[in-house]
């Protein structure tokens, strides 16, 4: 049975509370005038050269936008370990926060100009919200977000990322669609499928054997 995406069910169910979040006021940012970043994978942050490249990308992004970066403990630990905390303080358009609660984070996804990430679930959430998402990875477990959604896989290269940022800023980025059945009703369809299966004659006869 094809039922949809239960993660989107959660997003739809809590959307009213998400939109009521005051995180934009707390961070003193305006809708569509900031970029959202998440970075935590070992391949990205566990070596000094990778972190240097990441800070170059941050400099690139903050030429045009403020950048909100809810930083993962792993990433912060590596920045401290490699003696790179000064690079954070030097960029006045970089807004570093602790990891945020679900409602606040989803509000940032909803209101950002675009996303730069190496994470997983945010690829689906951004596609549902129709927000451009640059995923700095070679592959993804969520291919439909690339095939028909707003997600793109981009090499961890300043030149490649700059090209895609320019496309977004110039409104030349691809126009994705929300995948079929991402409508907040997948849980209902799961229940209906289970009830149909449990009430079928073939299933009853199997249980009686």
Label each region the model flagged.
Residues 1-69, 75-209:
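Nucleotide-activated sugar donor-binding and catalytic core shared by glycosyltransferases
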């Amino acid at each position: 049975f094809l039922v949809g995406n239960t993660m989107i069910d959660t997003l739809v169910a809590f959307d009213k509370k998400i939109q009521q979040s005051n995180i934009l006021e707390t961070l003193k940012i305006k809708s569509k005038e900031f970029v959202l970043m998440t970075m935590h994978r070992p391949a990205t942050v566990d070596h000094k050269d990778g972190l240097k490249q990441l800070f170059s990308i941050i400099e690139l992004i903050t030429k045009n936008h403020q950048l909100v970066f809810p930083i993962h403990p792993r990433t912060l630990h590596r920045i401290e370990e490699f003696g790179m905390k000064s690079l954070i303080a030097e960029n006045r358009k970089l807004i570093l926060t602790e990891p945020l609660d679900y409602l606040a984070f989803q509000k940032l996804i909803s209101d950002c100009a675009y996303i730069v990430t190496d994470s997983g679930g945010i690829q689906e959430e951004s596609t549902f919200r129709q927000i451009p998402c640059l995923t700095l990875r070679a592959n993804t477990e969520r291919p439909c977000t690339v095939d028909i959604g707003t997600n793109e896989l981009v090499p961890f290269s300043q030149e490649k990322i700059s090209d895609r940022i320019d496309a977004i800023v110039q409104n030349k980025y691809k126009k994705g669609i929300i995948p079929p059945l991402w409508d907040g009703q997948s849980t209902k369809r799961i229940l209906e499928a289970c009830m149909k299966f449990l009430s079928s004659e073939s299933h009853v006869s199997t249980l009686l054997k």
